[in-house]
């Protein structure tokens, strides 16, 4: 299992946690015997260093500290079940907002298959473009909107992706209420300009 620290744990990018079973380590060794594996991608070397309580690359200590702080907070606030509830609460709010908006719908129609950690909304109003919304959000000058709301590279072009991670709003939906009001305002201004 491999997971990045920058998503649900709120740490900076470029760091990850790798959890390997003994069987996975055996496969890594077998592959290493069959072909050349670059040192930085060699899981058997990573495991060897881990057994020595060392790293074979100098990690970002800030990310390790942030990861540890996030884990402590998560454990104190419901652990996995609590974080699951929080992410689902964020996603539920976004779904309800999108369905009331008149210009958004969840990209994945079947609720069973929707991600509740990274929620993608398709823009249903043909007069609206995600790029225009993003530029307008960036122009607000609000720090957390300086990049707008980017779609995932593999998602359809005219869509918005909003993170539902625990640390976006660790206390509920207040940050999502602010964000959606801002998006609604920007969209209303864009629609007025198109008239």
Where are these regions (language model features)?
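Conserved C-terminal alpha-helix-loop-beta "cap" of PLP-dependent enzymes
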Residues: 99, 103-174
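Flexible, glycine/charged-enriched surface loops at secondary-structure junctions
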Residues: 77-86, 103-110, 147-152, 190-195
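Short, low-complexity, polar/charged sequence segments that are solvent-exposed and flexible
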Residues: 20-23, 36-39, 138-142, 182-185
């Amino acid at each position: 299992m491999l997971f990045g620290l920058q998503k649900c744990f709120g740490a900076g990018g470029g760091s990850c946690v790798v959890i390997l079973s003994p069987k996975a380590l055996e496969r890594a060794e077998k592959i290493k015997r069959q072909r050349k594996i670059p040192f930085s991608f060699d899981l058997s070397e990573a495991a060897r260093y881990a057994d020595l309580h060392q790293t074979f690359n100098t990690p970002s200590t800030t990310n390790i500290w942030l990861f540890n702080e996030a884990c402590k907070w998560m454990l104190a606030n419901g652990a996995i079940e609590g974080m699951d509830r929080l992410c689902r609460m964020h996603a539920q709010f976004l779904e309800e907002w999108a369905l009331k908006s008149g210009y958004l719908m969840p990209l994945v129609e079947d609720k069973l298959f929707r991600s509740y950690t990274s929620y993608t909304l398709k823009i249903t109003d043909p007069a609206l473009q995600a790029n225009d919304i993003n530029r307008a959000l960036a122009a607000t000058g609000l720090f957390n909107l300086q990049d707008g709301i980017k779609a995932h590279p593999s998602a359809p072009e005219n869509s918005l992706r909003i993170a539902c991670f625990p640390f976006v709003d660790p206390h509920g939906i207040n940050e999502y209420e602010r964000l959606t009001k801002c998006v609604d305002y920007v969209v209303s201004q864009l629609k007025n300009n198109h008239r």
